[in-house]
């Protein structure tokens, strides 16, 4: 048998059993095996035994996983914040990679000490990065707390070129199915004060449509949270909108898409924008929620969005019907008042004339 005299040799197997993982060199395990795993596989492997847990806890492995999964996390500002997390990049990955549990009600905290939110945003097309940006939002000024919640990553006159090509986009909906299948987005919000993070995106689009006037393509990612307890709860929606402008090349059948807008807003069930204070409280509370590692989270997120929009549309239609009924009742009341007024005036006019005629006859 070979002895484990160096890190590049195979260790001696245990007595009466198979060599197992102990027969693999630690250098081989670190360099050739663990580095080839994705984050979820690495996390699952760390739960198998204490030896593997020790190897899988290597900070460099998780730093590599975070940078490969979200290129924006390589930013120096993000790196400095992640270094303050309890277990560094491993904690950050376990916070950001799973989906948030949206079915559990969020209880708003009495106060929030968060002074800023860091947005680490990456957009992928066919697994290639086409947009990566880090944005800092201060959360203590009166402007943020009292204004509607909105985070914009692209300047008004800025156009970011992409490698997304569209062919015959006006004749069929192939461009739509292509974007629904191949475009993905992660919007990780980081709280430096509480040392927590969460991805508020559904990763896959929940809606893709073309604006009827400008021709721009609006791609929507949405996360819906339940705020409050079962007896008194309300649904709120955090929406990420990506606007793609189509740039046609001369004498070519293909068109290039450019990113015109990447924004995050918060709305209630009636479509009203939430203020910064309430939105911040919801986001901070959501970062402390349970996470879901279940497969098919993108499809589930889209299904929840469709259900939410159906309820929202039904409520809007009911509200419109009630408004219409109220308007008709109000109109009927005014017509009745006008009719009664007309009849009263007619009665007074006739009464006055009859009195005058009677006086003449008496004379």
Curated annotation (Swiss-Prot):
Signal peptide range: none
One term under GO cellular component: SCF ubiquitin ligase complex
Domain F-box: from-to ranges: 27-66
Pfam families in the cross-refs: F-box-like
GO BP annotations listed: regulation of steroid metabolic process
InterPro entries attached to this UniProt entry: AT3G44326-like, F-box-like_dom_sf, F-box_dom
Protein name: F-box protein At3g44326
Organism: Arabidopsis thaliana (Mouse-ear cress)
Region (Disordered) location: 1-23
